[in-house]
Amino acid sequence: MPDMDIDVKDLEEFEATTGEINLSELGEGFLQSFCKKAATSFFDKYGLISHQLNSYNYFIEHGLQNVFQSFGEMLVEPSFDVVKKKDNDWRYATVKFGEVTVEKPTFFSDDKELEFLPWHARLQNMTYSARIKVNVQVEVFKNTVVKSDKFKTGQDNYVEKKILDVKKQDILIGSIPVMVKSILCKTSEKGKENCKKGDCAFDQGGYFVIKGAEKVFIAQEQMCTKRLWISNSPWTVSFRSENKRNRFIVRLSENEKAEDYKRREKVLTVYFLSTEIPVWLLFFALGVSSDKEAMDLIAFDGDDASITNSLIASIHVADAVCEAFRCGNNALTYVEQQIKSTKFPPAESVDECLHLYLFPGLQSLKKKARFLGYMVKCLLNSYAGKRKCENRDSFRNKRIELAGELLEREIRVHLAHARRKMTRAMQKHLSGDGDLKPIEHYLDASVITNGLSRAFSTGAWSHPFRKMERVSGVVANLGRANPLQTLIDLRRTRQQVLYTGKVGDARYPHPSHWGRVCFLSTPDGENCGLVKNMSLLGLVSTQSLESVVEKLFACGMEELMDDTCTPLFGKHKVLLNGDWVGLCADSESFVAELKSRRRQSELPREMEIKRDKDDNEVRIFTDAGRLLRPLLVVENLQKLKQEKPSQYPFDHLLDHGILELIGIEEEEDCNTAWGIKQLLKEPKIYTHCELDLSFLLGVSCAVVPFANHDHGRRVLYQSQKHCQQAIGFSSTNPNIRCDTLSQQLFYPQKPLFKTLASECLKKEVLFNGQNAIVAVNVHLGYNQEDSIVMNKASLERGMFRSEQIRSYKAEVDAKDSEKRKKMDELVQFGKTHSKIGKVDSLEDDGFPFIGANMSTGDIVIGRCTESGADHSIKLKHTERGIVQKVVLSSNDEGKNFAAVSLRQVRSPCLGDKFSSMHGQKGVLGYLEEQQNFPFTIQGIVPDIVINPHAFPSRQTPGQLLEAALSKGIACPIQKEGSSAAYTKLTRHATPFSTPGVTEITEQLHRAGFSRWGNERVYNGRSGEMMRSMIFMGPTFYQRLVHMSEDKVKFRNTGPVHPLTRQPVADRKRFGGIKFGEMERDCLIAHGASANLHERLFTLSDSSQMHICRKCKTYANVIERTPSSGRKIRGPYCRVCVSSDHVVRVYVPYGAKLLCQELFSMGITLNFDTKLC
């Protein structure tokens, strides 16, 4: 069926009609075409990195203001130094932050404001940042004691606040790095003007430029706050609030203070503010008046005798620690005593502690008591086996932290540091008699600026829960090998764990990952399963700004009673983002009304609604960090009756309920069809439907053709390694970039096949390689296993030819820099007669001219001092190239720096690595002349010959299917009934919906080829027809960055380590080749002892030492005078006082060094020697 579109107006008219339509009337082809258009609309709206941009934009618009407002009014007291102020007339001050404004990124040069773009920061080694200004109010006052009328006020004296001065001004508080393409970035506007300004054509932003380097946030998986965490080792239920990170824990444990025969009874205790309190005492401190009332709040409906005994034992424990706690405020007084007796007691009163730190989302103490009873009931139900414990590996219990949350936490830490410095500085002036200086004199703007820059540079960020700790792995360098690697880095997630401890099941896939996290894209090694990649349709929710509580009441929610007497039997709890906000009588109709209004955009589109029938709860989430994904709503697919062709945006699909964004908890109640085919078989049993199964994969897996036919490990290698190492087109603006190392393919091509993901994304740059004619054959034995043989003529015509651009950077201090140095010690750029290298290509300014051919030993950047000291940068061993560009500039730190880029053309040579898109990585083993290659009847000569043994062991039949499909696509097919009309077929190789083998073979047959892709070929050397047929077809191959020219190592003699006398390791320092344990074991297995002795001894650190055979100790070589009177030098045993039994042995110098080090520690070794 041809593709058909839906008209928006007709769709709205159709919604008014009634009556059900059978989905089979729409047709499978129409529904699949609609899914493709819906996915395209999704990518047009959200793209692939919207989660990075949305999080940062929300932080700039709302989160940054909340950080400053959270500090409230800060009181600054004087230092109370009686030496400075003897009259004790102390002054106080209060500081309050007001409105926060963030400016656009600008750069000032000679007091001139210049336009500042990301490529300026990259070239000038600067940070692409914007200045933060905040309105600060400073109030200076005195406290004076004034007498009052005791009969009117009840006090003899009271303290009167006398205001001395009030100032308001906008000050610079620091600078914040700007995310490229965010609302602060000047390149966020779409259009071709950005490309003219130097912006890359396919740069989507989402990263930062810190001191010239591109940095990206790795999304952090953190445990969700404001949720009940039930654990069975030991039995506890905990609640962690959002603002205050102090956990509130209810523990069910054995009563340690009871007598022995009662030891098995479990009691309920509460861990609150670093102290342990019996739960019954906390109930009465919150306003519960009787034991029956507390039991009704718990409302445990089981008949388990052990739980009943635990509740009774908990009452007895409360009676034991506090007598008469049911009377008056005795329970509250006991709680206050316990809190004040902790090591670090809070400054607030007990009432304030209960209000601020105990369930801060609930305002009254009665509601807090109800929530406490709800926690106790959940714990007891879990202990009785009626409720499951929480799974920490499930994404329902996690939130994704992105740029907004990470920057908010880091800025809060540095702002607190700046506040402490401000307080200490203001205290000194408040104690004196002089006026206070302007507030910018006390608030150091460099604290936030330098703190954020240090966090980005080092990668150490504030821990989410522990104040004094830092975590790593939050920020990473953005990969620029090709656009696909850039997208992978921007969609990566990470779970922070301690590798030394037990990780548990964190590395294994979880059912909650389905459709949100790619189940193949994960690295190997210690990060396996911990570093993940989001799936194509995975979307991270943002914080909802609109209040939904009133709308919940309109949908039938009842208000939570502010008492502890009214029973809640038959009512279902309604939790909004973890806070208990109300009740509902009929949860089924209430949830149905909520979903209906959400599908009509009366409620936030990203709202998640979960109905828990087992626990009688309705959980609603509108917070940020949840992983959502779009699904088709089956009951609304009847609106898609075929109408006139037209296009519509993704928002329209959400507004009319055809699609909806489903969260992890809500999807547990959905019955989702895997595809249109499965849906059409039984449409009545499904509530939702997938757009396509290939969207379950990540961006790197979804573009692999026939991925479902390959071994999972091979797809993992392609998605996690090969596609990120493939040489393509990294950017469209290489002339204004000075990356340390970049690769560019001369003639990148797009493959003949298509996948649904690449077609919906409209990104041909996701493929980095060329289409090569590949033959599966054994050729001269040079393509054993993974080796390949390539056509030399194809390489000479430019196949897989690339260029490598390496930049060398150096910086010097400007002459007018603040760092005072002697003129003869000031390093400057310039040409000097260097002793460390050749300066033939340098000009007088110390830089080479454009087009200069430089090789090993040449000076690439000349630097010297007035005294003649040489600080030049020299090309190391194997480094060479032609000078492409020279950049000289200065940054905002007063330093001049230069960058010289060398270009080197790389044509494939022996040892280079290539890979297909199926994980078939091979090393180029031989370059064969074209006339010696086998050729077909049509005269087609293959570009690459691979060994047939590479397929059974690696289990990649997908490559064979790709070659057969591409062969049919590339060749014209004659239409039936026409002798001259030809057309080209384009077929999709989308994973899980690929064409069948029969369909591919019929396509080859219609094109005039063998059904199974085999070709009759002739020997290029003899011209004879070969007996066996060879499978041949076009296959998309990638050239990897692993090239033999960068890895080949050779040396005869060279530098050795001064301590161990072994060859150094660095290749550029003429280092040796590593001979490790695996190589040693291999030679041992072959019995090549002479070769082993040569490698590990003769060619490494051969040495000799002397041993006394009598005392078996080490003999020294000393100069001594024997009885003859003439001095001689030789080995001598100091223990035996003789040289008669001394022999010479050959040992590695590393062993000799070990003996000497042990001897220096007082450890003597005995050696047994034997004459050979």
UniProtKB/Swiss-Prot annotation:
Keyword line: DNA-directed RNA polymerase, Magnesium, Metal-binding, Nucleotidyltransferase, Nucleus, Transcription, Transcription regulation, Transferase, Zinc, Zinc-finger
Binding-site list for Mg(2+): D786
Highest taxon of source: Eukaryota
Name of the protein this chain belongs to: DNA-directed RNA polymerases IV and V subunit 2
Tissue: Mostly expressed in seedlings, flowers and roots, present ubiquitously, except in sperm cells.
Documented EC number(s): 2.7.7.6
Substitution effect: R629Q: In nrpd/e2-19; decreased DNA methylation
The gene coding this protein: NRPD2
GO cellular component: heterochromatin; mitochondrion; nucleus; plastid; RNA polymerase complex; RNA polymerase IV complex; RNA polymerase V complex
Catalytic activity: RNA(n) + a ribonucleoside 5'-triphosphate = RNA(n+1) + diphosphate
